[in-house]
Amino acid sequence: NKKVNIRIMNLSRNFTLSELIKSDTAIRKGINNNPNAEQIEKLKALCENILQPVRDHFGRVKVTSGFRSVDLCLAIGSSANSQHAKAEAADFECVGVDNAELADWIKDNLPYDQLIVEYYTPGEPNSGWIHCSYIEGTPRASYLWAYKSEGKTKYKPIIGKAKDLV
């Protein structure tokens, strides 16, 4: 029964487990952010079906948040039921690519469950980031824009293209 070094484990051709579990908050607060075997399989599916195709099309993908243990989710004010805690979601950007263009490409080409253009300001291509989840089975194909209004995060369905948001 050989112990696997999860830090260098490949999830797909260009993504490692360490990239998907890295958290400065977890390190600072001493929170265990290591996924179990089932969660690692879900992260592989996320990489193979979403992140790797995005990288193949656009180039470098900067993952800002991947797997978050329930304890980490609670520590940052997120939900214990977050798709990040289920190893089904990642937040990311592609350097030099407008986040609306990136989201529209994912919508048109990949089997996402939930796709959220987070805190994107139309006309500011570098604003915000993409939250995308993948699940086995039938995805919801939920396409949303998250934005701040009166100090709260609001969600609005995107009908058509994110690049047409006003």
Residue map of PLM features:
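Acidic, His- and aromatic-enriched active-site or binding-groove loops in soluble protein domains
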Residues: N81-E101
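Structural recognition of the beta-strand scaffold that forms the well-ordered cores
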Residues: K62-T64, A89-C94, H131
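Short, flexible, solvent-exposed loop/turn segments with mixed acidic/basic and small polar residues
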Residues: A75-A85, Y120-G123
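Catalytic cores and adjacent binding grooves of peptidoglycan-active enzymes
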Residues: I6-I8, C94-V166
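Extended, low-complexity, intrinsically disordered C-terminal regulatory tails
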Residues: N49-G77
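Extracytoplasmic cell-surface/polysaccharide-interacting catalytic and binding patches
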Residues: V4-R55, K148-V166
